[in-house]
Curated annotation (Swiss-Prot):
Main location: cytoplasm
Entry similarity comment: Belongs to the EPSP synthase family. MurA subfamily.
EC number: 2.5.1.7
InterPro entries reported for this sequence: Enolpyruvate_Tfrase_dom, Enolpyruvate_Tfrase_sf, MurA_subfamily, RNA3'P_cycl/enolpyr_Trfase_a/b, UDP_GlcNAc_COvinyl_MurA
Protein name: UDP-N-acetylglucosamine 1-carboxyvinyltransferase
Gene behind the chain: murA
Residues bearing PTM 2-(S-cysteinyl)pyruvic acid O-phosphothioketal: C117
NCBIfam families: murA (TIGR01072), PRK09369.1 (NF006873)
GO molecular function, one term: UDP-N-acetylglucosamine 1-carboxyvinyltransferase activity
Keyword set includes Cell cycle: yes
Amino acid sequence: MDKFLISGSGPLTGELRISGSKNAALPILAATILAQGKVRLANVPHLNDISTMIALLRTLGLTIEIQGDHVVIVDPNTINSYTAPYELVKTMRASILVLGPLLARYGEANVSFPGGCAIGSRPVDIHLRGLEAMGASIEIDGGYIRARRQGRLKGCHFLMDTVTVGGTENLLMAAVLAEGKTILENAAREPEIVDLANLLVAMGARISGIGTSTLTIEGVESLTGCDYSVMPDRIETGTYLVAAAASRGKVRLTHTSASILEAVIVKLQEAGADVTTGEDWIALDMNGRRPKAVSLKTAPYPAFPTDMQSQFMALNAVADGISHITETIFENRLVQVAELKRMGAHIELEHNTAIVTGVERLKAAPVMASDLRASASLVIAGLVADGETLIDRIYHIDRGYEAIEAKFQALGASVRRIKS
């Protein structure tokens, strides 16, 4: 199992190109099942989760051609199976996203219950209730969700009783081929859902209310292929900005957008960063200053994203002052606290809130990654620690960060992958 060896260094400085969004590319890849022609996707990140989704689509029979590192061409017309097997689904929760497209296009879907990060209970009951409201019959058998329809799915008015990104994506993809009008209330509003909706529109779907909490879909009989470029990764963008701020550095990130990261940028400015932006770039400069502690509370978009919480905890660990970080989305997403405390961080837990008292520097220690974003917080902590930090179980990082060691090295950091 690979590990990272990180030597604490000075401020991060330089320029980076941000990759395409993992959390947009995964549902977009699943959505290609809906098309009747080839779909050419650009700016697809080279990540383990993307490879898993491609392997899943190939298992279903889709023909996939990869051109270079970031272009994927999908021909969905060769599909010959409607079963997403446990062997693939167990490694990545986003596998559930083939459920809606398979059911809508082919009338049948057999999908194993999903896996992925161990960050709490993320039930799929809203996905299933929404599909049943569209006329699907669903049973759970042997660890599989088995969904069927007679005739086309039927448009419906469905209120999601909690905001769910995956549920919104699955029901949106099912609704585009349903008969009649579907209204999805309390829909998630994340930029990645906007990106998925824009792809579906490019394929011929009729969707209004994109970017709002009410999506209205007029079902069509078929969708075509198209060319589409995946949006930039806002969490990767935020991670490198936070790392630069924690290290008192100066960076410029290209092929990204400030408009998808407003809540994070506000907190970085609170921490003392000078942030300037352009149409496709963000620059951050700490002017050599120690960051100031910033308190935050995670909530659905457009509020502060749960996927950036752990990175800010690493920043607050070396910030001037005391901060409160409250996690409201996932119940187990403060797991990085124990590892950060091994490095000398002063953190106390009160229910779902971490109280962080900043120290001048952390101290290197062997630590273990537990999920994707907690892993990123440990990398940031290693960069602002005295000595060499060894991070185990970095396969979590490889699920969501493209070439992370090379990118940090380009900013002057000492991050080495050690093959086991």
